[in-house]
């Protein structure tokens, strides 16, 4: 919730009154909170490879296991193990190293804090209050968020549609780049 408020405050400071909003993974949780708090400012919402539950059912490992792996194996090893689940081709994916490099930009404490925030968050009850036109994007090989998470979003957000990308994992935008970009632009540009 504090990240949601921080972003909303920044937008307010920059005098951005209305905007489209896309959230990927944990960012999807943040945009759900932003929409709950200031939905009138959001033109269209995109919930991408995310869900309404932080303790993600069907995730490749529990959040507690990720925290334990972080402590035992360190940030570098944990980041590698998690990032390889984000691609169908794992470590052989074209943009795998981009994710690893991004992971190097954080600290052990920040990584652990994000996992704690993940685990303790549940936005299911707030979904019915999201009235914004919403696109839900999910890859059929996603090991972080299963289909039930995407379906829960679709079922509980009244003005939503779900698009499933076949042959993609958690990072659809890095596996089917053109198709992903076209899908997002079409959603934003069409009434």
Task: Label every model-predicted segment.
Residues 23, 27, 31:
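Gly/Ala-rich beta-loop-alpha elbow adjacent to hydrolase catalytic centers
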Residues 32-37, 42-73, 77:
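Flexible "cap/lid" loop of the alpha/beta hydrolase fold
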Residues 55-61, 72-128:
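Conserved alpha/beta-hydrolase catalytic His-Asp/Glu region
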Residues 143-149:
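Conserved alpha/beta-hydrolase "acid-adjacent" motif
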Residues 151-160:
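Active-site-adjacent alpha-helix of alpha/beta-hydrolase-fold enzymes
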Residues 160-191:
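Catalytic active-site module of serine/aspartate enzymes centered on a nucleophile-bearing elbow/loop
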